[in-house]
A protein has these predicted regions:
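Conserved non-cysteine loop/helix-boundary elements of the Radical SAM core domain that shape
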Residues: 25-38, 59-214
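Short acidic/His/Gly/Ser-rich catalytic and metal-binding motifs that mark active-site loops
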Residues: 13-17, 191-198, 242-244
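Short glycine-enriched loops at secondary-structure junctions
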Residues: 9-12, 186-191, 237-238
Length: 344
């Protein structure tokens, strides 16, 4: 499966949310149809036709665009659908730009998934961020999308002005009730040229530290994943413009935020098992894990290993990636390490 991304930066959105500099985030500066054609042609050079492929309009509020422009852009993806280069289209928009007329148009042009920029379901947080919509409008938009047969995505943030962890948890509970199909999780960053940057520079706003952002994002990730909501991204895509020198003024940015979150969740999951193993006889705690999970279990800069080593001291803690399907934790003697590490 391949996704053909088509960026329409800030197009269709009349609001300037305090954290948003959409031209920087989307990596493009115009929403012209010619620009969309150019992007599509670039991807067609290597994308093999498949009904599993998808075209995705990113970066703006698609249903807020002028109707004529919406139709012109959808005509481009209609051609791809007709040639069976793709099998469906997805796009993102604002919750308050969803109505029956708009959804009729999208459904007629092969759109299958609509992502909503929800960010929070706490009205006080939405107001402080100058989102321009309410939590109720999100609920109504999701219900209408589902009634038309669309899959629904939600984009959520942690670390917004006025948003504490309790607010994040309350939003998660409301999202679970909405039952979206997919979600993205973004820790808020202070981007150059935004109203939030002015607040930060004036000492009126303090972003989350990386560790706290990981903790809160992990909470969202875990609770949504547990009920089958697919997490399709954690953290902003670290493209050249976003990462340009001086563009990110402050905030919990990391190019592998998703891996940090998964490592944190593994730490929380495995800690009780490690402590239980430490009650057994032996001078070493051996963690055997599938090769593909080793970096996540280890944690950034061996963070998880260091954390567990303190808990089990003076025992030695050893992590080994091998060809197994599940993580195994055992307490063994140093003399038996080699044999234990080869167990199935």
């Amino acid at each position: 499966m391949a996704i053909i991304p088509i960026f329409i930066p800030h197009a269709g959105c009349p609001h300037q949310c305090v954290f948003c500099n959409q031209k920087t985030i989307s990596g493009q500066k115009t929403a012209a149809v010619d620009g969309a054609k150019e992007q599509i042609n670039k991807w067609l050079e290597w994308v093999k036709p498949s009904l599993e492929n998808e075209a995705a309009f990113y970066g703006g509020s698609f249903t807020g665009l002028d109707l004529a422009l919406q139709k012109e852009l959808l005509a481009l993806t209609d051609e791809l659908l007709g040639r069976k280069v793709i099998g469906s289209v997805r796009l993102s928009t604002r919750p308050d730009y969803i109505d029956e007329e708009r959804l009729e148009l999208l459904r007629a042009h092969g759109v299958k998934l609509v992502e909503l920029g929800v960010q929070s379901l706490d009205d006080s947080v939405l107001q402080r961020a100058e989102r321009g919509h309410t939590a109720r409008q999100v609920t109504e938009a999701v219900a209408l999308l589902k009634s038309y047969g669309f899959k629904v995505g939600v984009q959520l943030m942690v670390g917004m002005p006025g948003q504490d962890f309790a607010s994040v948890k309350a939003t998660v509970e409301q999202v679970l009730a909405l039952q979206p199909d997919v979600a993205r999780i973004y820790p808020l960053l202070v981007i150059k040229g935004t109203p939030l940057a002015k607040s930060y520079e004036a000492g009126e706003f303090e972003p989350l530290a990386l560790e706290e952002a990981v903790c809160q994002a992990a909470y969202v990730y875990q609770h949504l994943s547990e009920v089958g909501i697919k997490i399709i991204r954690v953290g902003l895509q670290p493209d050249d413009e976003l990462c340009a020198e001086g563009n990110i003024i402050a905030g919990p940015f990391h190019p592998a935020m998703g891996e940090l979150v998964q490592s944190y969740l593994l730490r929380e999951q495995l800690t009780p098992q490690i402590l239980e193993a430490a009650k057994q006889s032996g001078d070493s705690i051996l963690i055997l894990c599938p090769n593909k999970l080793e970096s996540k279990v280890r944690g950034l800069r061996n963070g998880n290993i260091k954390y567990w080593s303190v808990l089990v001291a003076p025992r030695k803690l050893i992590l080994k990636g091998i060809s197994i399907s599940k993580i195994k934790i055992i307490c063994v003697s140093s003399n038996d390490l080699e044999e234990a590490a080869t167990q199935d």
